[in-house]
Amino acid sequence: MFQNNPLLSQLKKQIQEDIPKRQGKVKATDRGYGFLETDKGKRFFIPPSEMKKVLHGDQINAFIRGKGDKSTAEPNQLKKTGSAVFIARLVIKQKNISIIPKNPLLKGFFKIKGSQSLQSRGYQDGDWVKVELVSHALEGNGFLTQIIEKIADASDPFAYRLLTVATHNLANKAPEFDHPWKIIDPQLSRSDLTKTPFFTIDGVNTQDMDDALYIEADENGWKLTVAISDPSAYVPENSDMDAEAKRRAFTLYLPNFNVPMLPRDLSDSLCSLKEGEKRATLCCTIHINKKGEIEGEPAFYGAWIKSHYRLNYTDVSNYLENEELSNDCWKPSTQLAEQLRTLDSLSLKRLQWRTDNNAVFKNQPDYTLKLNNKGEISEILCEPRRSANRLVEESMIAANICAGDFLAKHKQQGVFNTHSGFSSERLGKVVSLLSEFGIESDIQTLATVTGYTKIRQQTNLLHNSYLDHRLRKLLSYADIKNTPEAHFTLGVDHYATWTSPIRKYGDLLNHRLIKSVLLKEDNIQIDNEIGQVLNAARKLQRLAERDVNNILYSQYLKNQVESKWRYKAEIFDIIKAGIRVKIQENGATFFIPCSLLCKDSSDATKIDCNQALGKVIIAQQTELQLGDVIDVMLNNVKVESGQLIGKLAESLTISE
């Protein structure tokens, strides 16, 4: 009787038009219900029954029922799903086949298209898969998915890293191209330096060796030659291989695992500066005076070289840092020893010159996670920066400064690493903060490289960790640009990296630009969006690195929750909810909520974790601050999220 009744349809439409509507994003919880969050900051409750129609992250239109605090959102129209593609675990129980999303906030029953053929295609219970959402519950009958690919077998102990890489849409294996590896720039003249005794210093297991060094002392100081492997001699511009390298942007490094930017035929073989192998390189010879200052114009040129010595950081550091070595320790030949001692002298002078005239970072240790065959941490090495690291770092920094100036002068374009110092809107805060420590400054001076560098040198003399942390939080973000700009944090006018072209796409581009100057060509242009492309790729890689480390640390430390082990930790962040600390012995990060800063959690409201001041304040007294090194203990491990919850070894005292 009422079916297809136009009056009834019109009435229904009118009623719906009269109901208030809101557009926003769905935020799920682990308790079944959720919220609709609008762009204007309003939140509307979504009951569990309605949450079955939507997914976490969906952008929807919703009817708003009720008023005030009791108003609820009823999902009505999907604008865009936040889960078009996601990672899930396959569950096969006899004839019942389903998936459980890796993200615990993705609730709902997901049907699988073609599920009955999965087992015959080699899929097993527990396998990890990438799935595509074919239809949405708001647009039809439930959620229908389709498997795109298998990511990892259920039995793979290293599945977590493949899952992490897939979650961030990163490549999980080396690119493969059927390509004849021939020199594509025969017009570039290459000097024959195969008899010059270049050497490499890398990790013991490094395969993609891209820099070699040679040094001579002269009456004015030193002549340093930096030879960099030249993959641009093999990778054609605008080719499919070049496009893939641009998409990846960097080689991805995870514990015991890497995914190269270039095919391994290049990265680990033809372009790796292996001992005794003839390789195409781009070289830079730099003259440095006895004060450690770069003098004159650096010389860039193509060359064929052979690495005469493959060295590692540990052996070189042990040799340079010890006057006497036991018979079983590595010792260089007479020729190599002279080079190492000469480069050691240069690097010390160069570091001192930069300390006096530029800006120098405080050295931080490296943490190396050693894994067993189960994919778990077997050992964590805390490795301080040693003399061999200084040799390489000072050489590379000098070479990159030279490249920045060279490209700025000859091309007015390139891939420049830039940094504008303190954020412009925070300069007033910087001036006020510095005045508290007796340092006079002004906004205009701080906005220049010279002024910023001078302030950095003054603050370094104070050796005040609290001030260093506060200033760091007032800095702008580093950026990558295609036109020359200063790098305040290094204290230089230009900085363009070209020393890692095997593993960084920006460095590969700079190789092409430097060579275009040598060949007097003007056919290479750097896109305006190159900085956005490289920054976005690096952000994803850092998220993947963080996620893998969180998983490994949580597995490694979960059995220490009940122990009374005390860790030395430095406070590096203070937010309203608590503090974040870095464990000095293993590099792990603990979060300590306010409730675990004191003995009685009910006293947490009396603790002011002041983010603006970087201090923990109780009754107007500073109890803790950024840069403090304190004793902490592990309180809880959230394995699912990889979060480590800590507590103070000695709780803060709360007065009555």
Curated annotation (Swiss-Prot):
Q: Which PROSITE patterns match?
A: RIBONUCLEASE_II
User: Sorted alphabetically, which Pfam families does this protein's record hold?
Assistant: OB_RNB (PF08206), RNB (PF00773)
Its Enzyme Commission number?
A: 3.1.13.1
Q: What is its main location?
A: cytoplasm
What protein family does this chain belong to?
Belongs to the RNR ribonuclease family. RNase II subfamily.
- Matching NCBIfam families, A to Z? 3_prime_RNase, PRK05054.1, RNase_B
Which protein is depicted? Exoribonuclease 2
Q: Provide the species name.
A: Psychromonas ingrahamii (strain DSM 17664 / CCUG 51855 / 37)
